[in-house]
Amino acid sequence: MRKILLSEAIDDSGIRLLEGRVEIVFCPEPTEKAIGRLIKDADALIIRTAGSVTREMVEGAGRLKVISRTGGGLNNVDIEAATDYNIVVCGVKGPQDRMVAEHAVAFMGALAKQFFYLDAQVRKGNFASRKEYRPAGLSGKQVGLIGLGRIGRIVADICIRAFDMQVTAYDPYVTPETLGSDDIVLKEDMADVIQAADFLSLHVPLTENTKGLMGTAQFELMKPGAFLINTSRGEVVQEAALVDALKNKKIAGAGLDVFEDEPPDARNPLFELTNVIATPHSAALTKEVVAQLAKGSAENALNVLEGKKPSYSPNWDIVQAKLG
């Protein structure tokens, strides 16, 4: 019986799909050392956000045919190495998109209304805070989107339709012809989007081009009253530059679901700032979506083992061509 290694536990919907069809092996912890030790005898690996798959691990995995992610981001897998060894890398796209978009918009509302600050004041007995502070509204505000893929477009749709906000966007892979919307203003220069935004929301994958995308120069362009929203990947933002921008009031605040290092150190200076709202990379993790992602990743792994194309894979065609 073929063997599937799970780097972490997944929802029961995925387990039920695997049971009786493959031998399931659970990794004791999602570390490179633990995964690397057990991957040597596995035909497939299902991996979540924690842990990573390196070239060294792939080189030692003689039986491995597929690496299946419980999500769409594949930045914790060395895809080039996997392709060199004819291993299909696949992920699940779709179920999480709306949830991540909702999370980004919720950050906007919470930051503009200062829910967390005012909640703390009320709990302290400072009901007079209602006179001391004036939250902002969303209607008519400018939303800047960096990245206009599936999630970015949903964010734009919610902001425009629900809150009557104005949306500008930068995405080098989107043209006015492929945009298909008269409601979104597409800019050729990212700086134009950053400068105009009251809320700057990041929706890009982590690549060599997007790593460190937001640094000191970019924060200098933002309005002093603007907020940064990041539900994409932590390494897209240079955290030291963000801390400096927040402390020196170059921007008004930030809503962060992702961090440069995950899990972040509890002493991370971002957590000392009252104008930061942080969540634990949980934007997509609703009960329904977690089940769909687990099932989708299990289906992808089984399909590849049976010679069928997975729902999403950046290297399926390349591997199939190599195998003839």
Give residue ranges: language-model regions:
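Structural/interface elements that position substrates and couple domains in central-metabolism enzymes
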Residues: 2, 25, 97, 168-170, ...
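Phosphate-binding beta-alpha-beta segment of Rossmann-like dinucleotide-binding domains, i.e.
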Residues: 85, 93-142, 154-162, 312-316
